[in-house]
């Protein structure tokens, strides 16, 4: 019986650890989504800025800088999209593991009562 309680306690600790990790991933996913949104806004801003700059302003260097910034922001958006996908996969894996632990714990508790 003591062995069952010890195993049950270990499973509860594992469940809590996984739940905390899942919550952390959810926060990181939200953070990535905010960063994606912010960088998309920057890309739009730079697109609009490029439309307003006229060739007669003789600021070709500024255009080059703006284009570089635009590319940098687009790359950041892509990086955050990839990171969000990776975090979502980890979250799904943890959720599956939590279900398995919960089922295992329920079976163990049922066995312990018998």
Curated annotation (Swiss-Prot):
Its main location: cytoplasm. Residues 70-111 form a coiled coil. It is found in: Cytoplasm. It holds the Pfam family DUF496. Signal peptide: none annotated. The keyword Coiled coil applies. The keyword Coiled coil applies. GO terms for cellular component: cytosol. PANTHER family: UPF0265 PROTEIN YEEX. Belongs to the pole-localizer TmaR family. NCBIfam families: PRK05423.1 (NF003844). This is Pole-localizer protein TmaR. It comes from Actinobacillus succinogenes (strain ATCC 55618 / DSM 22257 / CCUG 43843 / 130Z). The lineage of its organism: Bacteria, Pseudomonadati, Pseudomonadota, Gammaproteobacteria, Pasteurellales.
């Amino acid at each position: 019986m003591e062995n069952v309680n010890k195993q049950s306690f270990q499973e509860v600790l594992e469940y809590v650890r996984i739940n905390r990790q899942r919550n952390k991933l959810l926060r990181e996913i939200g953070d990535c989504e905010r960063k994606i949104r912010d960088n998309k806004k920057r890309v739009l801003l730079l697109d609009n800025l490029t439309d307003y700059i006229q060739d007669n302003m003789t600021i070709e260097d500024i255009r080059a800088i703006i284009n570089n910034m635009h590319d940098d922001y687009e790359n950041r958006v892509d990086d955050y999209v990839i990171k969000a996908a990776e975090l979502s996969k980890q979250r799904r894996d943890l959720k599956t593991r939590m279900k398995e632990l919960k089922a295992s714990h329920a079976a163990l508790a049922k066995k312990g009562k018998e």
